[in-house]
């Protein structure tokens, strides 16, 4: 369910821009911009409780999936722009290129095994589209008819290299129906914006993991890997 208009999304992202320009955001971040209409249309199909997996460029997705904008701004303001997540809303992100499709496929498998009516939505860039991890995840989802939809957010740029630069052509691979693609032009540079910010002040703003996750469970050091066991099975870790 899309919760914001195009204008509102831009205004929320502008708050991050203004904070950076005011020298109060000395961290790496990746701004969204130029794909508001496409994302609003997609999130109108996403239900509360559906699983959403996103890349390092994730602010719009977080807003549209119901994460409080103040929480997003707080996380971004403390250097966690690339790692936004909300376990209760089943929202996860990762900065590892091509690192989330296989996780999304695994969650979709667990949902199918549990008979859940929830669905997985996995957003990747056209750089991650080039990875073997994505190919394997797509093949597994398609072959097993899993409730997972991959969305390629294609701005024709992987960091600063176009498809032509990477492959010698701009040919688009033809994926099965579990993969959709939308094309857009990114409004901002790959990371940050083209203005100076004093990175030396980062320690004044950054919170510790203990401050963010006060109830984070501490696990004992594993001395013998053969004796190690997980408290939860994979299916138990995925809620219905």
Question: Locations of the language-model features?
Answer:
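Conserved internal helical-beta-strand scaffold that buttresses enzyme catalytic cores
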Residues: 1-26, 35, 73-88, 196-236
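Short, hydrophobic/amphipathic alpha-helical patches that form generic packing surfaces
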Residues: 12-14, 41, 240
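Cofactor-binding active-site loop characterized by glycine-rich and histidine/acidic residues
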Residues: 17, 24-144, 168
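Glycine-rich ThDP/TPP pyrophosphate-binding loop and its adjacent helix/strand module
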Residues: 90-94, 98-240
